[in-house]
From Swiss-Prot:
Primary gene name: menD
Top EC class for this record: transferase
Cofactor(s) it depends on: Mg(2+); Mn(2+); thiamine diphosphate
Function description: Catalyzes the thiamine diphosphate-dependent decarboxylation of 2-oxoglutarate and the subsequent addition of the resulting succinic semialdehyde-thiamine pyrophosphate anion to isochorismate to yield 2-succinyl-5-enolpyruvyl-6-hydroxy-3-cyclohexene-1-carboxylate (SEPHCHC).
NCBIfam families linked to this entry: menD
Species in which this protein is naturally found: Mycobacterium sp. (strain KMS)
Annotated protein name in UniProt: 2-succinyl-5-enolpyruvyl-6-hydroxy-3-cyclohexene-1-carboxylate synthase
Length: 547
């Protein structure tokens, strides 16, 4: 067995032992030893392999798999720009705390700076965006007469791989995230003719080489619930049963609120204190409340990042130790304004003469059912889902809220669907046309690759960036330039784009969406709904006026 083959087999075996169920592989020559080892593990049913030609989309596919499966996922690629293309996914995984392992093959390090082809200083390329940069080191030449050497190397390689998995999952830090695992591989890069497929042994019973129980990060915080309190539940909020009775503005990716409070209803209330869970990222009324110096804020998070954008948090912790009882009159008032806000949104939607992205989001929100998985694009869709009063009981909601970019959303949805398929449930993804077009190459799934069994991508197509209609850039005084430089119309034929990738698709009206989503289907499909963005500003103004 040549050194690179031995090293790759040990790494793959130990990754599986460490809990890796899925690996995304991008083709290349330098990562051939890893490719052979991964293909062997896939054939043996030890992991599921996904081959992609684009490293950028591969990274987001891995994010979708990791988030939905709650397990570390690897992306393996060759050296050079292949590694650099993981940049956006690594940044998202960092801030969303997703266990993404970048398994980067490299040339032998002595070739750095010599002009060697497809070679750059890739170890450490991601800087402080990763939890760790770990190099396995170049495997030495192996002597058939020195079994002791292989025993020592096997232990070193397995220990290093365990270190990678532990860093990615946050077992010792309570801070999951991306890790770069850089492996320089010497030639020969393919197994020898007489190779018997063996692998140096790991621990008995399939256990990891180094067992690392997860740490518990626990910081209780005393909070009196007697003052009029609202809860703001953002991305990564976690479950807090002792706060369930409180009125809660829950973002779609947070656990569903038992006592929901519409984000636009905050303007009608005067809370005396706020409990913030996770990391809010969506609503301006929420940001304004959290920044109000007259309102104490208690921040409860599950990780080490500082949870205080406005600098207004009075105390931080991981869970509340509560005392006191909420005022029943306050709870009634919050329920009344929530019901009023939800009704106002729905009434204005019904009265509006044109179909907008908000109408599409309402139709999707009304169509999902328990057991579903809903993937929401950044920009308007995730906000629209909150505005229409969506409360996702029994629904798993995903959205890339780490740094909230639109890139990689198609691939994230496909990865999430592939993981959710194990439950037998369906996945619905809602995204805008720019988000869809930006990651349309994510639709490219080879004929031999695992494909989602039940994924519907709903594209709300208003031919550009509708969110800018609602921001300062959409002010009518900028109309002479805003459509071009912010709205960015593209005139892409979504149906033709889908057909190029052999993806079933059709264009429907928003009123047909509920029936279309309810009809049985197999595989992956795209439903396109034409929408208007020119009237979004007026629609949102009418909703605010109705409140």
């Amino acid at each position: 067995m040549n050194p690179s083959t031995a090293q790759a087999r040990v790494v793959v075996d130990e990754l599986v032992r460490g809990g890796v169920h899925d690996v995304v592989l991008c083709p290349g020559s330098r990562n051939a030893p890893l490719a052979f080892a991964l293909a062997d593990a896939d054939r043996a049913g030890r992991l599921r392999l996904h081959v992609r030609i684009d490293e950028r989309t591969a990274g987001f596919l891995a994010i979708g798999l990791a988030v939905a499966d709650r397990a570390p996922v690897c992306v393996a690629m060759t050296s050079g720009t292949a590694v650099a293309n993981l940049g956006p996914a690594v940044v998202e995984a960092n801030y969303a705390r997703v266990p993404l392992i970048v398994l980067s093959a490299n040339r032998p390090y002595e070739l750095l700076g010599t002009g060697a082809n497809q070679t750059f200083e890739q170890l450490g390329y991601f800087g402080n965006q990763v939890r760790a940069n770990i190099s396995l080191g170049l495997a030495p030449e192996l002597s058939s007469g020195s079994p002791g050497d292989m025993t020592s190397l096997n232990a070193q390689w397995r220990s290093a791989t365990c270190r990678v998995v532990v860093a990615a999952t946050g077992s010792r830090s309570a801070n999951a995230g991306p890790v770069q695992f850089d492996i320089p591989l010497r030639e020969p890069l393919v197994p020898t003719f007489d190779d018997d497929g063996s692998c140096p042994p790991g621990r008995p019973d399939g256990k990891p080489w180094t067992h690392t129980p997860p740490v518990t990060f626990d910081q209780p915080l005393d909070i009196d619930l007697t003052p009029d309190t609202v809860v703001i539940a953002g991305h990564g909020a976690g479950v807090h049963p002792n706060l369930a009775d409180l009125p809660t503005v829950a973002e779609p990716t947070a656990p569903p609120a038992a006592n929901p409070l519409h984000p636009m209803a905050l303007r009608l209330l005067r809370p005396k204190q706020v409990i913030m869970l996770g990391r809010p990222t969506l609503h301006r009324p929420v940001s304004a409340l959290l920044a109000d110096p007259s309102v104490p804020v208690y921040a409860l998070t599950t990780g080490p990042r500082w949870p205080d954008v406005s600098g207004n948090s009075q105390a931080t912790g991981t869970r509340a130790v509560t005392s006191g009882t909420p005022d029943p009159a306050w709870l009634r008032r919050c329920k009344e304004v929530n019901d009023h806000a939800v009704a106002a949104v729905r009434e204005q939607l019904a009265a509006h003469p044109l179909t907008t992205g908000l109408h599409v989001a309402a139709a999707v929100a009304d169509a999902v059912r328990p057991g579903d998985q809903l993937v929401l694009g950044a920009s308007n869709p995730v906000r629209d889902a909150a505005l229409v009063g969506f409360t996702p009981h029994g629904v798993q909601v995903r959205s890339n809220r780490g740094v909230a970019g639109i890139d990689g959303t198609v691939s994230t949805a496909i990865g999430a669907a592939l993981a959710h398929d194990r439950t037998g449930g369906r996945t619905i993804a809602l995204m805008g046309d720019l988000t869809f077009v930006h990651d349309s190459s994510g639709l490219l799934i080879g004929p031999t690759e695992p494909t989602p069994r039940n994924l519907t991508i709903v594209v709300s197509n208003d031919n550009g960036g509708g969110i800018f209609e609602l921001l300062e850039q959409g002010d009518p005084r900028f109309s002479d330039v805003s459509s071009r430089v912010f709205g960015t119309p593209h005139d892409v034929d979504v149906g033709a784009l889908c057909r190029a990738y052999h993806v079933d698709n059709r264009q429907i009206e928003v009123g047909q969406l509920a029936d279309a989503l309810d009809e049985p289907h197999e595989g992956m499909r795209v439903l396109e709904v034409k929408a208007d963005r020119s009237s979004l500003r007026a629609l949102h103004a009418s909703i605010k006026a109705a409140l």
